[in-house]
Amino acid sequence: IQWGLKVDQTTNATSTADAVNTLWAITGNVDNPGGNIIIRNAFGQNLSYGYGYHLLSPEMQSKKLGAEFPLLSRAGYSSSAHADSVLAAIETGKPYPIRMVWMTSTNPIANMGADAPRLYRALKKVDFVVVNDLFMTPTAVAFADLVLPAAMSPERDSQRCWWVPNRTMVKVTQHEECVGDDVLALMVGKRLHPENFPWKDGIDWIESIWKNETDGTIPYTNFDEAKKQVWAYPPFEYYKYAKGLLRPDGQPGFNTPTGRIELWNSQFSLWGYDPLPHFKEPSCSPVSAPELYKKYPLVLTTGARSYEFFHSEHRQPGNISRELHPDPLFELSPAAAEERGLQEGDWCWIENQRGRCRQRLHINPSLDDRVARAEHGWWFPEEDGAEPTLFGVF
């Protein structure tokens, strides 16, 4: 069973994933040939977001916003603060004010902010904002006190170890003063806490990870060797749970409190979550918000992808992506379009309780009559970037 963002980013994401895992378990399709494979991170490298979290004192760690949401914050998977809690702290100043925001390669008012007007109002309150990006985006223009140009992949010596394989990226060019975000983090770290950033450059940092923070099976420990090999796969094995390869103590079993596959999730129970898969109605659905549904009688989805773009990237004029897909599109079924007197290609306003945007209609016969499917991530670099236009993002 494969799943993607349709499962990952919904109200019921965790519970749905739990249900799918249960199906794997009761049918015996776990880490076996033809079944669902349990993938380990390449050569034992740490996959958690936020490198260096262990260097913070317990007092500083306790101040992380969103600790009351333990699934990510206490599971060791992410050291990041809870995004909604950060937004609330900016708005209210509680439990403490957020005075500075640093954003790297993100364009939230065009893309990841589900409530862009709210996010716009909040980020305007922050004392100092740094944006590190490839392009001057609506987010950079709207909020940044300082814009730092980011290096593209061909301008970076780096590695990628998100699961497998381990991949080496080799720098082949340099444009002006652009640097990679890892090098930028090292530069800032050396000024703030040099004792925690002893490496002389980004390559030295990577080599230190290979030497000191892997399981000892990685086939290289210096960058020159890695450049020649380009990528490296760790040895692959089925039935890792039977060989002690899933638990930090090296014992057979799964990385759960009981060591078994748990249909009744004991860790969820400990954290105060329902230990069994369950359904929760979305907060703005026709069932949970009937009065809102009377005003806005279509269910709007915004997660659909277009093959030409990745989130808010590649919108520049002259780019082949914009030539193939020049305008933002939304979809209705033939019946829903006819009911509203709309035809293919019409420009329409799409509105809900959070705001509105304008996109062109594409009629999709496969779509449910109760649903409108809109694209996300749109902005128009060819338009004026200054306030209030902000490249047409609003």
Predicted segments with their positions:
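Extended redox/cofactor-interaction regions of prokaryotic respiratory oxidoreductases
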Residues: 22-142, 151-158, 170, 234-340
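Active-site rim elements
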Residues: 7-10, 171-178
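Aromatic-residue-lined binding/catalytic grooves and analogous aromatic/hydrophobic interfacial grooves
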Residues: 2
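Short, well-ordered loop/turn and helix-capping segments at boundaries between secondary-structure elements
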Residues: 25-32, 125-128, 146-153, 190-197, ...
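Long, contiguous, secondary-structure-rich segments that constitute the structural scaffold
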Residues: 182-229, 316-331, 335-394
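Stable alpha-helical elements in mature extracytoplasmic
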Residues: 10, 19, 181-184
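Glycine/threonine-rich phosphate-binding loop and adjacent beta-strand/alpha-helix elements that clamp
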Residues: 154-174, 189
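Short glycine/threonine-rich loop-to-helix capping motif typified by GTGT followed
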Residues: 11-18, 47-54, 114-115, 214-216, ...
